[in-house]
């Protein structure tokens, strides 16, 4: 009678405290044979991961007199389901070391964990244990082997495990399909896909996504059209493919046709417009959204920040805080907002962010730290920037580049060079931004030879100098009075020189009152810019500086005749070269 009552209560244990109360009755009345049911019920009804429950179950398992594979398997599966992959493997090893034979659930779960860990674990020993315990006839174990070997890149072993499955299900087929796709064998993956007897959404999405990532939107679109039931994820994959190919018109066509848009759909489109610099279209979509969540605000703020509209980014951030008390910015939001303030040179905002983080318990990650470093360096608060940089958990290309760029803007060549040397010693690969900062530092410090060495070393790091890098070199040579050398460098450029490059030569011509190169540079700027007022004004000043008053007057008259609005500033004066 008591046995039946305890079984009744065991079936209804849904929280830890209830489980403990029933467990106490089991121990007192020596009904230990019911403990496996307790373990199962406790883990089964726990929807969210709980460290207390795991500790409690482990204590029960350690106290078992008999070898209960079922209960150990429940714990292994629970940990795997909650993405505690390392602990899943550790518990499985404990079970094995205790001499307890694994259940099919335990093997399936640990195989999944092995493939999901950051440093994937070779599953061959587990495969051997499954064979020894006669579990390789289980379709779930066999499918788990296919999945693990696929992720490890052992595609032949995955294929063999797949062939051994007597009754293949859709999950088995998808595991093999995923394996070929992960190995980059798209043609073989397509053959597998075509053989799948009952394709599900995962099958379709895997193959469509692979074609989209490759940029083969013809095949991706054809498969999408053939897909019988399209999920929101399927639509997003196709839209994302067109976005990555910069085909925003086609992306917008499918977006507009999508029956049920979700947050990912809107964010994908806004991000696509962001990359193309089409802020107006991004704004239009943003306004169309009836209910905006934090991620959508993040996308739009990032759009403004990345496209040189920092004031709009800050205005939207303020609106987000005012209108949506339920939305709290996190490190991603704040990183974009800090970058916007960095463009405005407002270092005081960094102090506000640090206070906000402390007040709201937000974790300051390396992304946000790097944005703050960039803000402080550009604002001249070097002590704060260097302190924050030294406290980073992991220094990477982006954080080093932010520091070096800050040094470059402020002419700190020694510091920039030291950072670059440390970066190379730690085998952290530099990028084009790194060299922009380093070259700027050498340019501001007049270190021409070092600048040349740096410029020529870009190819050693598999980087091709861009027009911006050539522009900085022209600026550096121009500052040093080596105008002819700067002109020859421009003529040697593998790409078409832009107005920024010619503008650097024009400015240098003004510094040294050189009419010849000033005229050459200005003529190119006039051809390249729709409003060349600033360039013409500067040429007029060069004429005036050498006493050629008539020529200066002629240039100024031409500005008036063309009804150009005279503005003394122009892009190359406000850009990164100065």
Curated annotation (Swiss-Prot):
Positions annotated as PPR repeat: 68-102, 103-137, 138-168, 169-203, 204-230, 231-261, 262-292, 293-327, 330-364, 365-395, 396-430, 431-465, 466-496
One matching Pfam family: PPR_2
Molecular function terms from GO: RNA binding
Record SUPFAM superfamilies: TPR-like
GO biological process: RNA modification
The keyword Chaperone is annotated on this UniProt entry: no
UniProt keyword annotations, A-Z: Repeat
Region described as Type E motif: spans on this chain: 501-576
NCBIfam families named among the record's database cross-references: PPR
UniProt similarity note: Belongs to the PPR family. PCMP-E subfamily.
The protein's name: Pentatricopeptide repeat-containing protein At4g22760
Chain's gene name: PCMP-E6
């Amino acid at each position: 009678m008591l046995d039946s009552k305890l079984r009744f209560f065991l079936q209804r244990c849904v929280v830890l405290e209830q489980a403990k109360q029933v467990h106490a009755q089991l121990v007192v009345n020596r009904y230990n044979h019911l403990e496996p049911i307790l373990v199962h019920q406790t883990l089964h009804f726990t929807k969210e991961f709980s460290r207390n429950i795991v500790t409690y179950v482990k204590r029960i398992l350690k106290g078992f007199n008999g070898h209960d594979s079922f209960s150990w398997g429940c714990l292994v599966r629970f940990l795997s389901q909650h993405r505690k992959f390392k602990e899943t493997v550790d518990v499985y090893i404990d079970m094995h070391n205790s001499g307890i034979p694994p259940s099919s659930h335990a093997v399936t779960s640990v195989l999944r964990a092995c493939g999901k860990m950051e440093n994937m674990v070779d599953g061959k020993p587990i495969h051997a244990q499954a064979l020894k315990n006669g579990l390789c006839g289980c379709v779930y174990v066999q499918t788990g082997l296919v999945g693990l070997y696929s992720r490890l890149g052992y595609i032949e072993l995955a294929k063999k495990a797949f062939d051994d499955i007597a009754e293949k299900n859709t999950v088995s087929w998808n595991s093999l399909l995923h394996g070929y796709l992960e190995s980059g064998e798209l043609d073989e993956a397509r053959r597998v896909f075509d053989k799948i007897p009952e394709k599900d959404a995962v099958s379709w999405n895997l193959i469509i996504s692979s074609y989209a990532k490759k940029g083969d939107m013809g095949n991706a679109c054809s498969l999408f059209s053939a897909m019988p039931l399209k999920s929101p994820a399927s639509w997003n994959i196709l839209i994302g493919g067109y976005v990555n190919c910069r085909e925003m018109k086609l992306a917008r066509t499918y977006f507009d046709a999508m029956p049920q848009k979700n947050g990912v759909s809107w964010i994908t489109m806004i991000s696509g417009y962001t990359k193309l610099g089409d802020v107006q279209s991004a704004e239009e979509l943003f306004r169309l959204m009836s209910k905006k969540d934090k991620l959508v605000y993040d996308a739009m703020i990032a759009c403004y920040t990345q496209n040189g509209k920092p004031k709009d980014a800050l205005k939207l951030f303020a609106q987000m805080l005012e209108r949506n008390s339920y939305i709290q910015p996190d490190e991603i939001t704040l990183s974009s907002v800090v970058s916007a303030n960095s463009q405005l040179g407002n270092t005081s905002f960094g102090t506000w962010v640090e206070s906000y983080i402390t007040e709201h318990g937000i974790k300051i990650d390396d992304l946000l730290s790097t944005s703050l470093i960039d803000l402080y360096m550009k604002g001249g608060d070097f002590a704060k920037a260097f302190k924050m940089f030294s406290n980073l958990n992991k220094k990477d290309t982006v954080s080093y580049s932010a520091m070096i760029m800050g040094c470059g803007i402020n002419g700190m060549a020694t510091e920039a060079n030291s950072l670059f040397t440390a970066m190379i010693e730690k085998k952290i690969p530099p990028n084009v931004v790194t060299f922009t900062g380093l070259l700027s530092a050498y340019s501001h410090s007049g270190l021409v030879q070092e600048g040349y060495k740096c410029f020529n070393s870009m190819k050693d790091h598999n980087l091709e100098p861009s027009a911006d890098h050539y522009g900085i070199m022209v600026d550096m040579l121009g500052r040093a009075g080596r105008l002819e050398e700067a002109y020859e460098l421009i003529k040697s450029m593998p790409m078409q020189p832009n107005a920024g490059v010619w503008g650097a030569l024009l400015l240098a011509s003004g510094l040294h009152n050189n009419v010849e190169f000033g005229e050459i540079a200005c003529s190119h700027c006039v051809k390249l810019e729709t409003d060349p007022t600033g360039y013409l004004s500067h040429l007029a000043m060069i004429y005036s500086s050498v006493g050629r008053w008539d020529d200066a007057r002629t240039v100024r008259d031409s500005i008036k005749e063309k009804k150009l609005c005279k503005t003394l500033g122009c892009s190359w004066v406000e850009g990164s070269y100065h």
